[in-house]
Amino acid sequence: MPEKSLYEMAVEQFNRAASLMDLESDLAEVLRRPKRVLIVEFPVRMDDGHVEVFTGYRVQHNVARGPAKGGIRYHPDVTLDEVKALAFWMTWKTAVMNLPFGGGKGGVRVDPKKLSRNELERLSRRFFSEIQVIIGPYNDIPAPDVNTNADVMAWYMDTYSMNVGHTVLGIVTGKPVELGGSKGREEATGRGVKVCAGLAMDVLGIDPKKATVAVQGFGNVGQFAALLISQELGSKVVAVSDSRGGIYNPEGFDVEELIRYKKEHGTVVTYPKGERITNEELLELDVDILVPAALEGAIHAGNAERIKAKAVVEGANGPTTPEADEILSRRGILVVPDILANAGGVTVSYFEWVQDLQSFFWDLDQVRNALEKMMKGAFNDVMKVKEKYNVDMRTAAYILAIDRVAYATKKRGIYP
């Protein structure tokens, strides 16, 4: 578990970078705080006829550089603190990538596994109607997150469109391709992780074809990261895990086969061609690249001394606590931070939004080439700041992002 609340952890990362910059204290205070927090309590009629009331959130952290952008998650443990932290991170993630967005995030406190498909649709449509007062294709553009997918985005898009009386494709991203979605969106976060893993190997002088990689978390991000790292970089993926545990094989896995197995059996732990390990053991394996792509706070003060990887490429949001960051930095382990490493998803969401506004759609190669170019550009921008300030990559990414948002805030001024 994280030693601090997620929001405290996010603010601490911000403060660490802000203290190294010539940032006025009042401007820092503006950048720390969320612009708008909406809490909604809304009724949903269940299949048996009774009505349940659910709690939902939408937080817009900052809109100095453009509309708020960020996902909506469905989870029984969703809290306002968590949603505020994730919106905060989205502000810096979009700025690191130099996208014309600010940060937003949303969530509903619900266990979607306990809902029928009809109940899930009714909940989704009612929640989106409730937050419609603050969203729009030029205000705030939601996207999928934990337990939400292209189907949910289609319901959101239809709900908003019905309410305004015409089809508005650009209200959400992560939609089905047939409904204004972008090709390459599903693989985008994993592809971004792959690009960053390859660039981290370049920095450390590791030959990708001889590199070993462990991936914690085998959902969308972990699966695509593992697949693309093995297929396009030629590295050996020697360990993967999901919520039930992990498997290890020093000879490497056939990741395509592993993904098929996970789809059929719901887990990787029973896969016969690997030795069973725990999630904790996976993190401490002697590999070149570790990709934490599961939950927040996986690498913490309690295990950071035992991490043996040469680089950590963060597929998840907030997988490394500030205390662990200090330990890894002291030990010379390169950490490619979440606000850079997993920004592939929001970058292709940007491409989708642009395509929707223009009603002009790109082919898959255009999407992939544009994403790889932007990820490499952002990685190099962060490395320049890292060298200039002699700091770790996370602090450098924050300095770069804060500088961009602070500049926009100062140039816009305070209205009235």
Curated annotation (Swiss-Prot):
One of its GO terms (molecular function) is glutamate dehydrogenase (NADP+) activity. Coiled coil: none annotated. Keywords: NAD, NADP, Oxidoreductase. Optimum temperature is 75 degrees Celsius. Thermostable. Its EC number is 1.4.1.3. The active site is at residue 105. It is an enzyme of class 1 (oxidoreductase). PROSITE patterns: GLFV_DEHYDROGENASE. GO terms for biological process: glutamate catabolic process. SMART domains: ELFV_dehydrog. InterPro entries: Aminoacid_DH-like_N_sf (IPR046346), GLPV_dehydrogenases (IPR053388), Glu/Leu/Phe/Val/Trp_DH (IPR006095), Glu/Leu/Phe/Val/Trp_DH_C (IPR006096), Glu/Leu/Phe/Val/Trp_DH_dimer (IPR006097), Glu/Leu/Phe/Val_DH_AS (IPR033524), Glu_DH (IPR014362), NAD(P)-bd_dom_sf (IPR036291). It catalyses: L-glutamate + NAD(+) + H2O = 2-oxoglutarate + NH4(+) + NADH + H(+); L-glutamate + NADP(+) + H2O = 2-oxoglutarate + NH4(+) + NADPH + H(+). Belongs to the Glu/Leu/Phe/Val dehydrogenases family. NCBIfam families: GdhA_Arch. PANTHER family: GLUTAMATE DEHYDROGENASE, GLUTAMATE DEHYDROGENASE 1, MITOCHONDRIAL. Homohexamer. This is Glutamate dehydrogenase. It comes from Thermotoga maritima (strain ATCC 43589 / DSM 3109 / JCM 10099 / NBRC 100826 / MSB8).
